[in-house]
Amino acid sequence: NIGILTYYRVANFGANLQAVSTYYYLKNNGYNFVYLYESDDTVKNFQKKQANEIQKEEHVHFVDTVIPNQSFVFNANDINRAINEYNLDAIIIGSDAVLQHHPIRARIKKGKRKPFYIEKMVSERIFPNCFWGCGISEKISMAMMSVSSQNSEYKYFGKKLSRKMSETLSRMK
């Protein structure tokens, strides 16, 4: 039994197609699985700004039609509950740009009305979060598949942060 933690119910063709191809691979190879979709009101509000509603609805309708096994989770506690509820043996994290981190220094932007402002960011784009495996039970095996840290400005990562990220990633098997 495998849980797939990814960000696929979005207006993004790549995320949709990765989720669907993973679905068919697991289904055709006899695995039992459930998609764990992490979302909260902050993410929903952010998504509304990113795509028009009709396009987003079509993307979500597409993946909901193809992928029947879905569980909505909002934090690590929900993921740990899903591990028990679905008797999961492992979790696959990914794919797509789920390993992002945008430190505050990278989010300082030149403003039009003010000299500068700090760009808001949803929690899923700041380390630590569940996509890095943070807060998920140590008892379960986890692996990452086709993940990226797209648009993360590494030059702003300090040594302590980089070390903590490395420790977190070492849990993956």
Task: Spell out what each predicted region is.
Residues 4-13, 17-169:
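Aromatic- and Gly/Pro-rich donor/ligand-binding loops
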Residues 1:
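Glycine-rich phosphate/diphosphate-binding loops that line cofactor/substrate pockets in enzymes
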Residues 172-173:
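A short beta-strand/loop micro-motif in the catalytic core of glycosyltransferases
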